[in-house]
Amino acid sequence: MSKFLQQKPIILASSSTIRHKLMKSLGLDFLVLPSNCNEEEIKTRHKSDELVELGITLAKIKALDVSQHYPEHYIIAADQLCVAGKRVFNKPLNHQTAVSHLRELSGKQHQQIACLCIVKESKILWQYHETATLTLHHLSEKTIEAYLQAEKPYQSCGAYQYEGLGKWLFKEVQGSEDTILGLPLMPLVNALVNLKVVGI
């Protein structure tokens, strides 16, 4: 870390390589320790239609899970939900499901909801959510197949990687790129400064 920033110990509780890169772009020193919580079980148990509430709940559970083992660290956790109407598009995990997701989203508007929280000593110090709205072009079967073969975005909600070739799939985007990628940086920077986790 440069002499420009003074910081307290930070852990990013995420296995996402893109979140790791976004955090690195801030010039912070941090550990990466993903939570072991069962996201699918939490989603199944969640009864409310409030999807933001679900995303915030997932982020909190991840952060609290890591915080109990590292009380001296500030834990940053995030969750990303890809939503069209009331339908949540989870990571497709395989080619067939990715095809199905892109067919369903083709030509339509959907949202990427990024939810964040910061926890220290098992106390929630800050939580936040931000939404980006995206509209895909009408995608032919040939385009869907060619894109999936090129990028294999099976670990990405919505079955695309916006940070890569995925940008070519979109007709319109409203919202910041880092929100689409799952880590809204300016709100996070302000929170870290306000909580005195990072000083300049």
Curated annotation (Swiss-Prot):
GO terms for molecular function: nucleoside triphosphate diphosphatase activity. Its cofactor is a divalent metal cation. GO terms for biological process: nucleotide metabolic process. Its EC number is 3.6.1.9. Signal peptide: none annotated. The active site is at residue 79. It holds the Pfam family Maf. GO terms for cellular component: cytoplasm. Keywords: Cytoplasm, Hydrolase, Nucleotide metabolism. It comes from the Bacteria. HAMAP family: Maf (MF_00528). Nucleoside triphosphate pyrophosphatase. May have a dual role in cell division arrest and in preventing the incorporation of modified nucleotides into cellular nucleic acids. This is Nucleoside triphosphate pyrophosphatase.
